[in-house]
Every structure is written in structure tokens, then in C-alpha cells.
UniProtKB/Swiss-Prot annotation:
Binding site for 5-phospho-alpha-D-ribose 1-diphosphate: 97, 101, 103, 123-131
Gene Ontology BP annotations: 'de novo' UMP biosynthetic process; pyrimidine nucleobase biosynthetic process
Name of protein: Orotate phosphoribosyltransferase
Organism for this UniProt entry: Phocaeicola vulgatus (strain ATCC 8482 / DSM 1447 / JCM 5826 / CCUG 4940 / NBRC 14291 / NCTC 11154)
InterPro entries listed in its UniProt record: OPRT (IPR023031), Or_phspho_trans_dom (IPR004467), PRibTrfase_dom (IPR000836), PRTase-like (IPR029057)
Pathway(s) per entry: Pyrimidine metabolism; UMP biosynthesis via de novo pathway; UMP from orotate: step 1/2
Keyword line: Glycosyltransferase, Magnesium, Pyrimidine biosynthesis, Transferase
Binding site for orotate: 127
């Protein structure tokens, strides 16, 4: 039986949500050059896969975190899936902006949380973990307890692993970088010669250069 990590990795590859271009890297908003790009928001356009993600995240929330009082999605990528999970579990939903609105109530958190609530945060992708953990901080400032985070995918960067450890946030993901690379190699999505390039990038993405 396939693990969830491998199964979801295959599904992402099937809908071409994963782009692997070692010779022609992407440029992230951070300025990092990357041979790997994950656009798992594409799952929203496939009803059966969208439902799969909703049910798997909901199962993880129930199995891993016990009593949960609310679901929070990190804007903007995790808002749709977070809302679907909250609906499935019949729980209140909020979402957390990256910056407060510049008009109206200037909210950072949209929706209603009450002090003492136990919250699970939903995220679509973990890279450095910075924006995800800012959302956690905002929820904690509201007097709530973040009991965990569930994300669709993580790159597994050392900086993110350390950041989540320091923030004392239990992170669970549906799949990860290693599972996607393994599936991509087995299905011919990438070649053997691509693997060292991709491995070197993951070890030090901030300083990686194509062809080196």
C-alpha cells in the first residue's frame, strides 16, 4: 500500500502541479533561484483531488490534534482548503493576512476567535516557514493556542525545520520534497542526472546557481 506522501506526490505530478527545471530555474519572490516549483493550488481545479486533500487534512486534524475549536487558513493560498476543512469538521474558520488591511478595521485575522480557543492552522506550502509562523504569532497574540499546523507540501529546508522547532509548532504535511522527487524519478518526470542538482539546491537554496 502506498503511503499518503507517495500517493499525493503522484497526484501532484499527474496534474502538473510540480515543475522541475534544473537547467532553466525559476525565480522566487525572495530572489532565490529554484529548479523546483510546486503549485499545489492547482488541486482546487480538480474536484476529486480537491476533495481528497480536504478529507486527508481533516483526518489528520482529528487524529493528531484531538480537541480543536477552530481552523485558520494562511492567506492567500490556504484560504480555500482551510474553509473546506472547517466545513468538513463543522468548525469555525478564520484566515490570517500577511499584513493588516489598510482600511476599515485594519484586521490581521479575518473572522472571530475567542481567547483560549485551540486552533489548527492550514497552509498550502512550507518553504522557509516565515509567513506561516507569522500567522501562528498573530493567533497567539489573540490569546489562542495553536496546537498544530497541517500543510499540503514542505520543501523540508533546514531553516524551516529549525524555525518550527523554536516556535514549538507541530507541523504535519501531506507530502514533501523527497517523496515528489522519488515519484518524479520513477515515472520519468526527471532523469537520474537531475537528482544531484536538485539535492544540492535543497541543501543551500539561498546560494544555489544553475549549472554548478
Amino acid at each position: 500500500m502506498k503511503t499518503l506522501e507517495k500517493l499525493f506526490a503522484e497526484k501532484l505530478l499527474k496534474i502538473k502541479a510540480i515543475k522541475l527545471q534544473p537547467a532553466n530555474p525559476f525565480t522566487w519572490a525572495s530572489g532565490w533561484k529554484s529548479p523546483f516549483y510546486c503549485d499545489n493550488r492547482k488541486t482546487l481545479s480538480y474536484p476529486s483531488l480537491r476533495n481528497f486533500v480536504k478529507l486527508e487534512i481533516s483526518r489528520i486534524v482529528l487524529e493528531k490534534f484531538g480537541q480543536v475549536d477552530a481552523i485558520a487558513g494562511v492567506a492567500t493560498g490556504a484560504i480555500p482548503q482551510g474553509a473546506l476543512v472547517a466545513e468538513e469538521l463543522n468548525l469555525p474558520f478564520v484566515y490570517v493576512r500577511s499584513t493588516p488591511k489598510d482600511h476599515g478595521l485594519e484586521n490581521l485575522i479575518e473572522g472571530e476567535l475567542r481567547p483560549g480557543m485551540k486552533v489548527v492552522v492550514i497552509e498550502d506550502l512550507i518553504s522557509t516557514g516565515g509567513s506561516s509562523l507569522k500567522a501562528v504569532e498573530a493567533i497567539r497574540r489573540d490569546g489562542c493556542e495553536v496546537i498544530g499546523m497541517v500543510a499540503a507540501f514542505t520543501y523540508g529546508f533546514p531553516v524551516a525545520i529549525e524555525a518550527f522547532k523554536e516556535a514549538k509548532v507541530n507541523l504535519v504535511t501531506l507530502t514533501n520534497y523527497e517523496a515528489v522527487l522519488d515519484s518524479a524519478l520513477k515515472t520519468g518526470y526527471i532523469n537520474e542526472e537531475d537528482v544531484p542538482v536538485l539535492d544540492n539546491w535543497r541543501k543551500d537554496p539561498a546560494h544555489w546557481e544553475a549549472g554548478k
